[in-house]
């Protein structure tokens, strides 16, 4: 299964991705982790990214897509993966789709964790209070408001893009973590046993 999790900051994407990884053998692919790994490995695209980052510049979408293209060919991604932190806008989504099409594949689903902004604020405040050493710098109302504004501006068109393609699945992210996990498994047609998602997505048993 090739999957994207969408949701605003504090929605619990990381937790849900980790649960899917552990229960269903999907590997969580973080854009930042992939960039650092590509640089460390000295791959061709990693060297390009290293030079760009050394200049303090943002890594272009085509370079990030190239790194993703290399990463999903690795053995641990054979059972599927969850993209974390990419795409963030429609242009990136189109570039990702083009790359996957070139490999003769496509995304299976895009899961949106729907969470009310006011609930997110409470979650962030709770997380900040529980963090050892004091609140994280970005865990305050002003920082969250800015992050949510950027998220909504970028992601609203992205949600519409995947909805038009029939890929979007939306769950109620305001439920408990266990309930959200259950919803995700339900909309994807997967059970606690690995591999059962295939029959739901393809109609084959």
Swiss-Prot record:
Region LID, annotated ranges: 126-139
MF terms (GO), sorted A to Z: adenylate kinase activity; ATP binding
Record has Iron as a keyword: no
Leader sequence segment: none
Annotated segments matching region NMP: 30-59
UniProt pathway: Purine metabolism; AMP biosynthesis via salvage pathway; AMP from ADP: step 1/1
Reaction catalysis annotation: AMP + ATP = 2 ADP
Positions bound to ATP: 10-15, 127, 175
Subcellular location field: Cytoplasm
Keywords associated with the record: ATP-binding, Cytoplasm, Kinase, Nucleotide biosynthesis, Nucleotide-binding, Transferase
InterPro entries the UniProt entry points to: Adenylat/UMP-CMP_kin (IPR000850), Adenylat_kinase_CS (IPR033690), P-loop_NTPase (IPR027417)
Entry-linked Gene3D superfamilies: P-loop containing nucleotide triphosphate hydrolases
Entry's EC annotation: 2.7.4.3
Top-level taxonomic group: Bacteria
Principal localisation: cytoplasm
Family statement drawn from the similarity comment of this UniProt entry: Belongs to the adenylate kinase family.
Domain remark in the UniProt entry: Consists of three domains, a large central CORE domain and two small peripheral domains, NMPbind and LID, which undergo movements during catalysis. The LID domain closes over the site of phosphoryl transfer upon ATP binding. Assembling and dissambling the active center during each catalytic cycle provides an effective means to prevent ATP hydrolysis.
NCBIfam families attached to this UniProt entry: PRK00279.1-3 (NF001381), PRK14527.1 (NF011100), PRK14531.1 (NF011104), PRK14532.1 (NF011105)
Name of this protein: Adenylate kinase
């Amino acid at each position: 299964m090739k999957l994207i999790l969408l949701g605003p900051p504090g929605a619990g994407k990381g937790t849900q991705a980790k649960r899917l990884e552990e229960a269903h053998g999907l590997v969580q692919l973080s854009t930042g982790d992939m960039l650092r790994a590509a640089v460390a490995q000295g791959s061709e695209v990693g060297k390009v990214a290293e030079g760009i980052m050394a200049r303090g510049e943002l890594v272009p979408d085509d370079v990030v897509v190239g790194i993703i293209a290399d990463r999903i060919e690795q053995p641990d991604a054979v059972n599927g993966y969850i993209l974390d932190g990419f795409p963030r806008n429609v242009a990136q989504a189109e570039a990702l789709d083009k790359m996957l099409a070139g490999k003769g594949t496509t995304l299976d689903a895009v899961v949106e964790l729907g969470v009310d902004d006011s609930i997110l604020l409470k979650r962030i405040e709770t997380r900040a209070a529980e963090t050892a050493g004091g609140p994280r710098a970005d865990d305050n109302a002003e920082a969250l408001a800015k992050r949510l504004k950027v998220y909504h501006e970028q992601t609203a068109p992205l949600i519409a893009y995947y909805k038009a393609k029939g890929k979007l699945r939306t769950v109620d992210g305001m439920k408990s973590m266990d309930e959200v996990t259950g919803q995700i498994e339900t909309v994807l047609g997967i059970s606690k046993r690995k591999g059962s998602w295939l029959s739901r997505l393809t109609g084959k048993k």
